[in-house]
Amino acid sequence: MLQPKRTKFRKAFKGRIHGAAKGGFELSFGQFGLKALEPERITARQIEAARRAMTRHMKRAGRVWIRIFPDVPVSKKPTEVRMGKGKGAPELWAVRVAPGRIMFELDGVPVDLAREALQLASAKLPIKTRFIQRIQE
C-alpha cells in the first residue's frame, strides 16, 4: 500500500477540505479519468482496492496512473480507552481529496472497457465520482 517513506511530523491535524481542487483537475497522462465530485479523506487501502479492481477488469492491458498519494497520517485511539491522555497512535494513511480532483487515469484500452473499469474503482471509494474523457481533436 502507498505511504510516505518518511515525514517531518508523526501526527497531523484532522483538517478540513474547503472549496474545489486547486490543482490536478485536468487529465495529464491518459485518455480517461475518474474525477471526485465530493470532498473526502481517502485511505491507502481504498486507493489500492480501486487499483486492483481496475487492473483485474482490464486484464492487465493498458496503463493506469494513480494521481493521488496518501500523505496524511490518521491517528486512532485503541478501543475501550477513556478520553484524554493524549492523541492516539497513527493508524493509517489518507489523502484529502477536493471536488474536481482527478484520482485515476487510464490509457491503452477501449472507451467501454475504461468506463467499466473506472466504475468498478468508483464502487471501492467513499465518494461520488464522474468518468471523464479527453476531447479528441
Swiss-Prot record:
GO molecular function, one term: rRNA binding
Pfam assignment, any one: Ribosomal_L16
Source organism (scientific name): Methylocella silvestris (strain DSM 15510 / CIP 108128 / LMG 27833 / NCIMB 13906 / BL2)
Database matches in SUPFAM superfamilies: Ribosomal protein L16p/L10e
Complex and partners: Part of the 50S ribosomal subunit.
GO cellular component, as recorded: cytosolic large ribosomal subunit
Gene3D superfamilies cross-referenced by the UniProt entry: Ribosomal protein L10e/L16
Name of the featured protein: Large ribosomal subunit protein uL16
TM stretches of this protein: none
Disulfide pairings: none
Family: Belongs to the universal ribosomal protein uL16 family.
GO BP annotations listed: translation
InterPro entries: Ribosomal_uL16 (IPR047873), Ribosomal_uL16_bact-type (IPR000114), Ribosomal_uL16_CS (IPR020798), Ribosomal_uL16_dom (IPR016180), Ribosomal_uL16_sf (IPR036920)
Gene designation: rplP
Role summary: Binds 23S rRNA and is also seen to make contacts with the A and possibly P site tRNAs.
Superkingdom of this protein's organism: Bacteria
Entry keywords, A to Z: Ribonucleoprotein, Ribosomal protein, RNA-binding, rRNA-binding, tRNA-binding
